[in-house]
Structure formats: structure tokens, C-alpha cells
């Protein structure tokens, strides 16, 4: 009999094809997740921070998340960003200044805080992935 899907965890990360297998491996092997709700967008959670620059992106993103959160009521949320994100380089926020990792970690922290305010029953964790020599390291973002 197949294992029942895990409705206790929600994951949000970038849709990067390069990082997909690494995200999946991390979630499965390091965090022990076989099933989870997922939203994957270019830039990951960054779209959720664009209230003033691209308000429709932010509104739609939070609307999709609310739908999925209401559907399964997960108690755990995992947010993942990654190094060399093309959305951060070439997307609508590419003109913003500052090191990419610092910007992404700031966005991850902000979305984690917003998530906790919107869904206070959830534990939210954020990670930043870096790829070097074919291996990916996932650092906790605090």
C-alpha cells in the first residue's frame, strides 16, 4: 500500500532546473520528506516581497499559498533560495543593488516573518543552497 501523502509540510522554492534535483534530494534525504505541498516559481519566495514594485505578483503568490494552506493546513513550512538565481540577475528586480546572497537571505527572512504572521500555527524554516563542484550545501537562514 502506498504511503499517504504528507499534508503537514509546505515547500516554496525557485523553479530552477539546475537546482531541482538538489532541492528534491535535500527534502527527501536530509529532511525526510517524501511528500509535501509545493510552489516553485522563478526566484522562489522573492515574488512575495514585491508589494510595491509588482503588486500583482505578490497578491497572486500569497493567494495561491493561502489556498494551499487552507486546503491541507500544514504545520511546517520550508523556504529555499539558491546561489546564482537567474531571476535575481535578469528578472524585474535585477536592477536592485547589493550582493545576491544577502538580498535572497533578506527576502527569505522577510517571507518567513510574513508567513508566521499570516499563518501563526506554522513553523517556518529557510535555507540557502550553494552549488560547488557538483555538490550542494544547504545553509540555514536565520
Which residues fall in each region the model found?
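Divalent-metal-activated hydrolytic enzyme cores
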Residues: 1-23, 42-60, 67-74, 86-142
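Short, conserved beta-strand segments within well-ordered enzyme catalytic domains
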Residues: 10, 37-39, 78
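Short Gly/aromatic-enriched secondary-structure transition segments
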Residues: 24-31
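A generic structural signal for alpha->beta connector loops
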Residues: 32-35, 121-123
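A short beta-strand-loop structural module common to alpha/beta enzyme folds
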Residues: 34-44
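Histidine-centered catalytic micro-motifs
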Residues: 76-84
Amino acid at each position: 500500500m502506498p504511503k499517504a501523502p504528507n499534508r503537514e509540510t509546505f515547500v516554496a522554492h525557485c523553479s530552477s532546473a539546475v537546482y531541482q534535483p538538489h532541492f528534491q534530494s535535500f527534502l527527501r534525504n536530509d529532511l525526510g520528506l517524501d511528500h509535501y505541498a509545493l510552489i516553485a516559481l522563478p526566484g522562489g519566495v522573492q515574488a512575495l516581497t514585491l508589494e510595491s514594485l509588482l503588486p500583482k505578483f505578490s497578491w497572486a503568490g500569497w493567494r495561491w499559498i493561502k489556498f494551499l494552506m487552507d486546503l491541507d493546513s500544514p504545520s511546517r513550512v520550508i523556504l529555499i533560495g539558491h546561489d546564482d538565481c537567474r531571476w535575481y540577475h535578469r528578472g524585474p528586480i535585477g536592477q536592485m543593488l547589493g550582493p545576491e546572497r544577502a538580498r535572497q537571505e533578506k527576502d527569505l527572512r522577510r517571507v518567513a516573518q510574513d508567513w508566521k504572521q499570516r499563518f501563526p500555527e506554522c513553523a517556518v524554516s529557510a535555507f540557502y543552497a550553494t552549488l560547488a563542484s557538483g555538490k550542494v550545501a544547504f545553509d540555514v537562514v536565520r
